[in-house]
């Protein structure tokens, strides 16, 4: 059995790490490189960086900080933000990232997933899904351009259908960003995770809602996700990664303990 992963998420805007609630009202958390170093030292298994306005701004992620991060940490990291071509991905991987993640650009052009997977291998290609639970229809809807409150919009994709589609196209890993739970720290959407786990045959990462160590445990135990991504509980030092992993190990979760 592969070890479960704890993955701090760093949303980047204007060169700094920020954090919002339900993808809105972002506050500045701090500088990118020191935070990356801190999480690596605490025992994170990998890091994910989202340049949250790159796609809506029509640009690719700023590569200068990617290179700086690669110099100071020794764990894998994934970068997302406006990657629309094989050339964009090549630059980010050349600057030191281990994986690239695409979200809105994949919705605009699903063939991008296949082209990237063919060039770099599926192990390098992560697809992020921003998913919103609509209470009226009792369904999960995929959203696009969520880094910009003015441009955020629902797509025609139901989350379950998009999960199936991107696997066919070559996604090597899926990060499910559950927008209703984002930043509110009341737990991952286990119902949604269980539904998607049943149809997901590549590594599935839960994102959105972690507030306590038990929330991580529930995601691993009850939804069998491969990794749990979180931001505010780590940024605000509510949960220490080393202590979290010790707790999870004590509860029988297969995890790399620092």
UniProtKB/Swiss-Prot annotation:
The UniProt entry, under Gene3D superfamilies, shows: Aldolase class I
Q: In which pathway does it act?
A: Amino-acid biosynthesis; L-histidine biosynthesis; L-histidine from 5-phospho-alpha-D-ribose 1-diphosphate: step 5/9
GO aspect biological process, one term: L-histidine biosynthetic process
Any idea of its EC number?
A: 4.3.2.10
Q: Which GO terms describe its molecular function?
A: imidazoleglycerol-phosphate synthase activity; lyase activity
Q: Name one Pfam family in it.
A: His_biosynth
Catalytic activity entry: 5-[(5-phospho-1-deoxy-D-ribulos-1-ylimino)methylamino]-1-(5-phospho-beta-D-ribosyl)imidazole-4-carboxamide + L-glutamine = D-erythro-1-(imidazol-4-yl)glycerol 3-phosphate + 5-amino-1-(5-phospho-beta-D-ribosyl)imidazole-4-carboxamide + L-glutamate + H(+)
Catalytic residues (positions): 11, 130
Q: What class of enzyme is it?
A: lyase
Q: Which GO terms describe its cellular component?
A: cytoplasm
Q: Which InterPro entries match?
A: Aldolase_TIM, His_biosynth, HisF, IGPS_HisA/HisF, RibuloseP-bd_barrel
Q: Which UniProt keywords apply?
A: Amino-acid biosynthesis, Cytoplasm, Histidine biosynthesis, Lyase
Q: Which CDD domains match?
A: HisF
The subcellular location is: Cytoplasm
Among PANTHER family, the record links this protein to: IMIDAZOLE GLYCEROL PHOSPHATE SYNTHASE HISHF (PTHR21235:SF2), IMIDAZOLE GLYCEROL PHOSPHATE SYNTHASE SUBUNIT HISF/H IGP SYNTHASE SUBUNIT HISF/H (PTHR21235)
Q: How does it assemble?
A: Heterodimer of HisH and HisF.
Q: What does this protein do?
A: IGPS catalyzes the conversion of PRFAR and glutamine to IGP, AICAR and glutamate. The HisF subunit catalyzes the cyclization activity that produces IGP and AICAR from PRFAR using the ammonia provided by the HisH subunit.
Q: Which family does it belong to?
A: Belongs to the HisA/HisF family.
Protein name according to UniProt = Imidazole glycerol phosphate synthase subunit HisF
């Amino acid at each position: 059995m592969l070890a479960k992963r704890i993955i701090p998420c760093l949303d980047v805007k204007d060169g700094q790490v920020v954090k919002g609630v339900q993808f809105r009202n972002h506050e500045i958390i701090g500088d990118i490189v020191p935070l990356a170093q801190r999480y690596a030292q605490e025992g994170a298994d990998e890091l994910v960086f989202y340049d949250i306005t790159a796609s809506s701004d029509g640009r690719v992620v700023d590569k200068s900080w990617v290179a700086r991060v690669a110099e100071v940490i020794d764990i894998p990291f994934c970068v997302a933000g406006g990657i629309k071509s094989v050339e964009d991905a090549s630059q980010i991987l050349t600057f030191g990232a281990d994986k690239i993640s695409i979200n809105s650009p994949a919705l605009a052009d699903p063939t991008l997933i296949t082209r990237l997977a063919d060039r770099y291998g599926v192990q390098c290609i992560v697809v992020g899904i921003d998913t919103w639970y609509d209470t009226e229809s009792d369904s999960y809807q995929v959203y696009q351009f969520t880094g910009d409150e003015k441009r955020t919009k629902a797509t025609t994709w139901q989350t379950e259908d998009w999960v199936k589609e991107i696997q066919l196209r070559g996604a090597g890993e899926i990060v499910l960003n559950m927008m209703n739970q984002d930043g509110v720290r009341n737990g991952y959407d286990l119902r949604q995770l269980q539904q998607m786990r049943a149809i997901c045959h590549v590594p599935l990462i839960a994102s959105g809602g972690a507030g306590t160590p038990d929330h991580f445990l529930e995601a691993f135990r009850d939804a069998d996700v491969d990794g749990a991504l979180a931001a505010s509980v780590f940024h605000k030092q509510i949960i220490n990664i080393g202590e979290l992993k010790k707790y999870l190990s004590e509860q029988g979760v297969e995890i790399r303990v620092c």
